[in-house]
């Protein structure tokens, strides 16, 4: 009985220490998503890979945000309709639901609003929302899937973008070595990695790079509009 009590006390103390580590660290654990509608997820996944949402019938969401390539296309800037080269680099889709806004300039408040943009962008999919909806409406299987997911086979652009956004929310990357270390697994990181993280904090990097994404939660001057000038001798 004493042994059982001792083990229980040790387990409680260990859990408390692990929970304290998570709460005290500026970078947080990426947790898997839960509670989403499975039918919307599967429909959104299909739409994610659907090239018929583009004018050329060749470009899908996955063309620029390839989930087999880290959620990007590994290009300086993406190639769109008629081989047009866009002006910006594609951000990764992984963990994107944790961003405080969408697009590099934050012009979309959430993933659903973001999903509507590329369809009508002349440099990307070069379609219209109405043509995209009409295309899906003409396909019996899609009408059936939308009926199952949304209770109606009358397809709307809002339902299209909602389904895509729902699928995107599943594209998280939990249980990285660092996440496991934050959860209390001391063997998940090497001694050098832990020392590097401590240096990262000591130098003040976490003032900007914090939260589950280790950053991406504020706007910064990047010199894209005009050269960034400062009198601060610290250029790091």
Regions found by a protein language model. Name each.
Residues 1-4:
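Positively charged n-region of N-terminal signal peptides that target proteins for export
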Residues 6-12:
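Bacterial N-terminal signal peptides
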Residues 72, 121, 139, 174-175, ...:
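Short alpha-helix boundary/capping motifs
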Residues 81-169:
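Periplasmic c-type cytochrome electron-transfer domains
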Residues 144-200:
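Amphipathic alpha-helical substructures
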Residues 20-117, 179-236:
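Short glycine/threonine-rich turn/loop motifs
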Residues 14-16:
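N-terminal signal peptide c-region/cleavage motif recognized by signal peptidases
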